[in-house]
Swiss-Prot record:
Keywords: Cell inner membrane, Cell membrane, Ion transport, Membrane, Transmembrane, Transmembrane helix, Transport, Zinc. This is Zinc transport protein ZntB. Gene3D superfamilies: CorA soluble domain-like (3.30.460.20), Magnesium transport protein CorA, transmembrane region (1.20.58.340). The gene is zntB. Belongs to the CorA metal ion transporter (MIT) (TC 1.A.35) family. It catalyses: Zn(2+)(out) + H(+)(out) = Zn(2+)(in) + H(+)(in). Residues 1-273, 322-327 are cytoplasmic. It comes from Klebsiella pneumoniae (strain 342).
Amino acid sequence: MDAIKGSELQIPDAIFAWVLDGQGGVKPLTDNDIIDKDKPCWLHLNYTHSDSADWLAATPLLPNNVRDALAGESTRPRVTRIGDGALITLRCINGSTDERPDQLVAMRLYMDERLIVSTRQRKVLALDDVLGDLKEGNGPTDGGSWLVEVCDALTDHASEFIEQLHDRIIDLEDDLLDQQVPPRGFLALLRKQLIVMRRYMAPQRDVYARLASERLPWMSDDQRRRMQDIAERLGRGLDEIDSCIARTAIMSDEIAQIMQESLARRTYTMSLMAMVFLPSTFLTGLFGVNLGGIPGNSWHLGFSLFCLMLVVVIGGVAWWLHRSKWL
């Protein structure tokens, strides 16, 4: 296998190009560096930048079918073995639970024992954790450990996001116990976030499990075991997502029941008010349409007596409703 020279990986608009020093640290790539399995190169690109796109389209260091995938063609998490290398698509959780649920960032990478090429359009926050460890000298030492650390960081971010959603569901359940209904669209957004998470994290767990079972030459048995642990941890997160989705369905039914009961109470109250004032409306209408003149209009106490009669009628109807336990 021909050696890779550092000059072949120099891209002006690359996000960064680092060489792993084999001791947990990194150093910037130079033209004189020789890339091998002991000191692999990590090249991180934004595939929308012109120089990076041109390099991806023309470089002989990548297989032809890898170039299109790294340029943004693949979206769902998946892994494809290509010789001794692997083409991997992963999803990362960026931001907070207040964002729209489609804010899952795609990261695509191809790696073998000497070269790691990762691409993205939007920033992948999980990579900052790995890069920070490398700059402090506590990071991965080779390609296999790098992949494990990246997958672990992605799972940490996913688990944290799932925990935030779980806390919001608990708060929502407490509010419903106090008959407090959430704002319109709040529960729908929360449910959609969970469904989108389920859609992408389930195949991502399968990617981790596949990497744990593949006999890639640049991954050790210990690294495969760690990858299997990561897959199981993400699987537990998926179980939590399923539980949260079921709980949101129950809360949706509870909210509908609360709204129905509130509407029924209002309708009941309006019906009682109509029943109370119906006799008085009848009497006032009856007196008003008397063509021979309103009875008692010539007596100075006629209007007062009529008002008193209305009060007695309304009071009698209210007493009857109360005795019948309608009021």
